[in-house]
């Protein structure tokens, strides 16, 4: 009797993200209190954000402008009429025992965001469009500081800082179109790029300016019905988002394979132990008892106002990437790296504006300068070499004034001290030797000094040509024109 081998079930993950973006307005969403991040506890508060009786909130119009700009950036439909609602729940960091949010009439619906997923091995870029269900405005809650634990459970006592209460948030809810931890992390990064390009948030996950909750379920591939959804919280980096999802996918598949039920719950990501743990059973929307906010009027936005705010939106990352590829001839990978931060893209473009070759400038920015920034933990705005200086350096190479090797040799000094590359080259006497007669004389001296190597070369060891090139460069301090040196050596070594 032959026993049939069980067919292994293939599963797919169904993932959606709820992203909270803290806006960088100077004052809170419904009062004039400061939004400064590192103020002493409970100093940026007033009767409005603390929910005292008899006070009335007033909408900060900068928050509305930011919401509309972000809505346009994600290709969303801007509502001409929307409203605020009270979301009722009880927690120590919520002084009013309700949060002012938006429920059934959000400011933005039906958006989308294109993401690019990079293969780590091949650097190949794959594009995918993720649907966005809605974007709405709301106020942030306060912050709990736990003694003896990183969360309420297990702490000996907790303190409440209400400075964050009333800080404006945009909540962006994706469709369940994501299928992996890598896709989810890239989606979150693309949102951060957008808010930074728009100038509405710093998108700093470590400071809580960008916070993501993951909703995830798994199901057999080909099945239409969704599995039981689990929410994951407490991820403060993009790598944590990816790792938490990858762990949770494996956990849910293992549970299903073992015949165990998946509970509708909220789980926490424990960075130290690289796992998710149960926090609480999941609440449904009905538990919040939403009803219209009686102290705020409905929000009406005219098409004229939308057009005014639209005109203030800069060229966004996806638009820049397309332009870099189609107009400048850059690879998808280089275009992606250059547009990751707005400051880097601006640095690159200003360098190219000097007339420098775009591909060469891209190579310098994404390789040598990027390595320097990473090694020294700097932003591109903190280096002394201005973008015009990089353009000048690339032009010196293109014109044959200096070699690429000389450029690399002087780059560290330019990055720390700045100044004109041309002036530095002239001062140090590093101008490339491109005169045929002068180079021939130097090559003749090198060949005459190495008769044994010459004999071996002419006996068939052609790889010794590299030795002679090196000797010429050494004798000239790296100033010999590499192309001309190779041409002259070919001629003289075979003579």
From Swiss-Prot:
Key word GTP-binding present: no
Please tell me which top-level EC class this enzyme sits in: ligase
Q: Which GO terms describe its molecular function?
A: asparaginyl-tRNA synthase (glutamine-hydrolyzing) activity; ATP binding; glutaminyl-tRNA synthase (glutamine-hydrolyzing) activity
Q: Which Gene3D superfamilies does the protein's record reference?
A: 1.10.10.410, GatB domain, N-terminal subdomain
Q: Name one Pfam family in it.
A: GatB_N
Give the protein's function: Allows the formation of correctly charged Asn-tRNA(Asn) or Gln-tRNA(Gln) through the transamidation of misacylated Asp-tRNA(Asn) or Glu-tRNA(Gln) in organisms which lack either or both of asparaginyl-tRNA or glutaminyl-tRNA synthetases. The reaction takes place in the presence of glutamine and ATP through an activated phospho-Asp-tRNA(Asn) or phospho-Glu-tRNA(Gln).
Subunit details? Heterotrimer of A, B and C subunits.
Question: What family is this?
Answer: Belongs to the GatB/GatE family. GatB subfamily.
Which PANTHER family does the entry link to? GLUTAMYL-TRNA GLN AMIDOTRANSFERASE SUBUNIT B MITOCHONDRIAL AND PROKARYOTIC PET112-RELATED, GLUTAMYL-TRNA(GLN) AMIDOTRANSFERASE SUBUNIT B, MITOCHONDRIAL
Q: What is this protein called?
A: Aspartyl/glutamyl-tRNA(Asn/Gln) amidotransferase subunit B
Q: Origin organism of this chain?
A: Gloeothece citriformis (strain PCC 7424) (Cyanothece sp. (strain PCC 7424))
